[in-house]
């Protein structure tokens, strides 16, 4: 319901890159990030997706023009059941819907693939998540199984 009256614009700067990953889990990761971009933005949402090769892997960035995340909240948003303060009060008195599980799931999936996820944001301006996924040639010993 939160998304029904929003105008969403996507720009993609996606290069075709090969990564060793589970496409179903990665699909859920990007669904979650894009859904959050829409949920925590005004009525006119602009989302940019970038992908590019870096040393020993690939970076994928998802950036929006949403409400932003404070520096303090950036420290906790990947923890289970934690939500950014601004997200709780964005829509009506009850805030935007959510349980604080989505970004914890994103982190879990990316780390299980041997990667990393980070956030850069400025309140009232933007949020940008960067995901690093390692090259297929890197060793996968010790990686966690996704449950």
Where are these regions (language model features)?
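Short helix-loop "hinge" at the ATP-lid/N-box region of the Bergerat-fold HATPase_c
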Residues: 37-38
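Conserved micro-motifs of the catalytic ATP-binding
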Residues: 14, 18-21
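Acidic ATP/Mg2+-coordinating residue in the GHKL
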Residues: 64
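Short conserved segments within the C-terminal catalytic ATPase subdomain
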Residues: 1-11
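Short conserved segment of the HATPase_c
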Residues: 69-86, 144-145
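Short beta-strand/loop element within the Bergerat-fold HATPase_c
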Residues: 44-56
């Amino acid at each position: 319901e939160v998304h029904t009256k929003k105008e969403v614009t996507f720009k993609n700067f996606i290069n075709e890159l090969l990564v060793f990953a589970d496409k179903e889990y990665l699909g859920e990761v990007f669904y979650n990030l894009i859904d959050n971009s829409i949920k925590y933005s005004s009525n006119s949402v602009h989302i940019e997706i970038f992908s590019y090769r870096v040393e020993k892997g690939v970076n994928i960035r998802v950036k929006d023009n949403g409400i932003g995340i404070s520096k303090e909240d950036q420290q906790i948003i990947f923890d289970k059941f934690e939500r950014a303060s601004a997200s709780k009060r964005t829509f009506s008195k009850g805030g935007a819907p959510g349980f604080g599980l989505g970004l914890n799931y994103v982190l879990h999936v990316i780390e299980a693939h041997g990667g990393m996820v980070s956030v850069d944001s400025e309140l009232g301006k933007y949020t940008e998540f960067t995901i690093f996924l390692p090259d297929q040639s890197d060793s996968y010993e010790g990686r966690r199984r996704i449950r």
